[in-house]
């Protein structure tokens, strides 16, 4: 069942990128993120109500609540950076960089949570990273130090989006 859920997640994530790019064409990326956040919050609480789990919010302990709030802040930062990157760059360039969050999350899980990574998993990390780098123009990669210093480029925001998305996974797990 998890493979179906993960596949649907990938499908919706791809659709999200295209719809988000169209959405930021005529508004600021911050306003677009705010609107999206409201829609997600209403949908999530609606699902919690439909499944009868909304009352569980009162039984969350303090530590879990803290990490869920931190995870939520990381999610918000990721979304703000992602929409800023999409408003400045092409989906075909922003999305692969954003998906480096998978690599970052696995590395952070290894370092911070002690989760194991198999040889095949390590090979996958290398393959995902190499594939991502192949999808970015060489001149954009060579200009990365300048972009990071100056800020404001699509690449800077896409990298920040990936980092915050990885932190979302780690903080939600703790």
Model-predicted regions and their roles:
Residues 2-9, 48, 55-81, 150-163:
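Loop-to-transmembrane-helix transition segments
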Residues 15-40, 53-58, 164-174:
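Juxtamembrane helix-loop-helix junctions in multi-pass membrane proteins
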Residues 41-61, 133-145, 174:
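Membrane-interface helix-cap regions at the ends of transmembrane helices
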Residues 1-8, 103-163:
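Juxtamembrane helix-loop boundary signature in multi-pass membrane transporters
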Residues 25-32, 81-97, 174:
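Structural motif at transmembrane-helix junctions in multi-pass transporters
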Residues 10-14, 18, 45, 72-77, ...:
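Hydrophobic/small/kink-forming positions within alpha-helical transmembrane segments
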Residues 38-46, 97-111:
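Alpha-helical transmembrane segments of compact multi-pass small-molecule transporters, enriched
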Residues 21, 83, 109-110, 173:
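Small-residue-mediated transmembrane helix hinge/kink sites in multi-pass secondary transporters
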